[in-house]
Structures are given as structure tokens and as C-alpha cells.
Amino acid sequence: MDERKKVVFSSVGASGRMAIQMDGAWRTFWQGLVDKIPAHRFEFLEMAEVVSSFTTGGDRALVRSVENFEDYMTFGAKQVDEAEMGPGDVLVALSECGLSASINGSAVRGYELGVKTYYLFCNPEKILRTHLDRARAVFECLDEYAANKKKGIDNGKYIVKIPLFVGNMAVSGSTRMQVTTVELLAAGAALEVAANRWLKENLTEQELSVIGGQMLSLDEYAEAFVSLNKQLSSGKALKGLAKAVDFEVNTYNQKGLVTYITHQYLLDIMTDTTERQPTFTLPPFRKFNDHTSEVSWAYIKDPLYPNEVAWQHVFRRPIKGLEWSKEDYIKMNASQDIINNPPMVSGNEVLEYVIGNEDDPSRYSRECSQLVLIDVNGSATEEIVNWYHQELTKYSGGVVIRFGQIPTTKIAKDEIRIPVELPRTCTDIMYHLLVKVAFNALSTGTMAKMGRVYGNWMVQVLPTNKKLIDRSSRIIASLAKIPYADGYDPCSVG
């Protein structure tokens, strides 16, 4: 950070969207300091650019999953090359359960380039080493680095593993809950601790006093997360969460639609709503000018800004699309299907998903259509509340769901309250975690009540890549009580 080197988060799927979220929260914090402490404005703007992110499939994957892309180590390696990283830069490879080839490929490539590479994984190392070639490639880099270090050899290469095994999933069939949550906690806490250290070293006591928020130790982040889970699973918070689940179940049982609106936490909620499609085989987000595809059950809009500006507030950096040609895919040994029909994942694709405050009749096109205002710590300003009440007349109904430190004054007739008290920190990581965990529970609870969870299996997963084909095979084998090998077509897995 002192040398303004890059810190780049690389990930896929749910963790990829989480990486974009951390990137955005980091930029928001430093850009927000410019008005508070203008004497350091140039330093703050430089610091905002230190952290960056990329996800497999590019930023388009934020709104719609890109099928099969995570199956290729070459894709992840190319994204590292395009990030123009070099010695002194840091690559944080958030590999989720260690199964995604693209992130393993980015970790290997980072190591080859002499980038300081950190590899986070949430499965037992022995299992990954024994059964997965794509994971073994990363561990071979780790072995080489350890051997060279022991011999006193410094060849400029650096890689460190950070195991985050959290045990078996209570509700299985998606990595988006336990695995992505623990990665957000670990990586987000590390970012905040680094930011706080820099601030203490470079600002005066009076300057520090106006920043606001607490500076936690790593142990205190763990304690805060324990508190988050305890509060959310008991008392008023649990009752509010259950009420929100019933609200959504009732809406969808009437073939209705839910449209969330928020500004400050738009990216957090977009992440959950996007993940519902592959996790529960629901209609994905559709482009604004697409009038033939099915409308997504849930959607998200920014009440303050039109589409182009709303997207700028989501990323707080230029949109990163993948401008890859057919020749690029051939060089990366992509499947013939991808070569023949390259997916539309350019930067311009993102803007075709309208999340701004433009009128969208498709969201209230059904008899049952619900407008849901999300308020976190009183983030719903008067302007947002007024927009909600104005737009509500177009919908059949609506509700305000309020999280965190909830002001006593009501802002709507119908409110669902989920009170949780957590520390406020520089990027507000604990409240981002609250929204993530709460919405994961909301969407999973809703799908469970609608029969899309059987036992503890999310049975309607959409098997669009090797990892999900494997997962679907395990579900079939478990429920049908047959050997795993009989649960899939080996030709499909490859």
C-alpha cells in the first residue's frame, strides 16, 4: 500500500461477486475521505486505486452466470495477464472450495509472474491434492516455494496458502453461504486492518478522529461475526427474517415478482438475487430490451440514479468485460462450443441490464408485484423513501425491510424489522456480512418452503459446469442410495 502496488482479488461465482463488492467498498471508503480530510485528497484517491478485482467471466457474471468458464485454468491465467500484474503486486485467489479451475489457473499464473500470491481454499488440503489435478497444480507451486525457501533460494516467486475449512455445509448444494461468507470475513477483515494501519501511520490524531468507525483487531472481527450469527438466529431478528421469508413465498406462490430497491447496498443484494438462478434454477436477469425471455422472479434497482450512473456507483471503476476473440479461445483450448459461439461477456453487455431508476413495466406486469425497499442502518434517505412511495402506486403491494441499527421513526406503513447491532468499521464489512447472510437465509428459506430443498440438499441446482455436474451427481447418488459412479455420465464430466 505504501508503494501503491496492486492488490487484486480473483474469484468466481458467488466469491467473484463478493470480490467485486470488497473492491467497491474499498473505493467508497477512500473516496469518501476526500471531503473529510482534503489535505490528503491525492493520497486517498491513489489508495482507492490500490485494490481491484476480477471474476471469471468478467463483470457480466455479476448479473448472470457465465456457463463453463470456471472449468478452464487458461481463462484465469489470461485474466491475470490482462490485470498487468508484476513483482510487488498482490494476488488474492479466492478459490471457494478449491474446485474451480479458473481460479486455480490464476493462482498458478500469479506465482509464475512473481506476484505475491495468496491462495484461500475451504476444503481439506488432502482431498484436493489427492483427487483434483487442477487443485494439485497450485499445491505443487506451494511445495516448490516451500522447498526453495528452506534452501534459501529466492527466485522472485511467492505463494502462501490460507486454509479456511469450515466443515460440511448444513444446507448443501451451493458454496454461496458458508464458503463465500468465511472468505468475505477473512479477506475483508485483512483489508480493513491494513487500511487502519496505514491511516494510523500517515494521519494525525485529529485527522483520525473525523474518520469515524471502530478499528478492530482480527480477533474482534471473529467475535463480531459470532455475535452477528447469534443475533440473526434469535429474537426479533429471527422473527423478522421469518416474516420476510413468508412474504416472498406468498408472492411467488401467486406467480408474483419482487423488485428490491436500495442504493448503498445494491451490490450486496444483486449478488444474492443473481445467485438464485443457478442455485435454484430460476429465470435469470433479463436485458431491458428483451421482451421475450421470462422475467426474473427477483430484481434490484437503484432509486437515485439512471442506469449508466447506477452502474458507476456499483463498481466505482471502469467496467471490466472480456473482449476475447475466437482466436483467443482457440489459444486457451476452450471447448468447440465456446469457440463456435463465444459468450457475450463484453463490458457493454453489463449496461443492457437496467438497474437504474428508469421505469420498467415488466417489474409490475403481473397481477402480484411487490416493491421492496431495503433500509440498512437508516440508509434509506428521504429522497429514496419518496421515490419508493411514488413508484409503489404501480405495484400491487410493497414493504420496507429494515436491517441493523434501525431508527425508531417508521418510513412506511408496512415494515419488516431485522435489528442487529454490529461494529461500524471503515468499509462496514460487518454490515455487508449481515446483508449477505440475511439474504442468503431469506432466499434459501423461501426456496425450502417452496419445495426446492429436499432434506439438506438444494436439489434444483443448474449443472452448468464440471463442479455443478459433480454436485448434482452426489445429490442423485445420496437421494437414490446408489454409488457415486452411477450418479453421472462420465462422458459429461470429462
Tell where the protein language model's regions lie, with residue ranges.
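Conserved N-terminal alpha-helical segment that immediately precedes and caps sugar-phosphate-binding
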Residues: 1-494
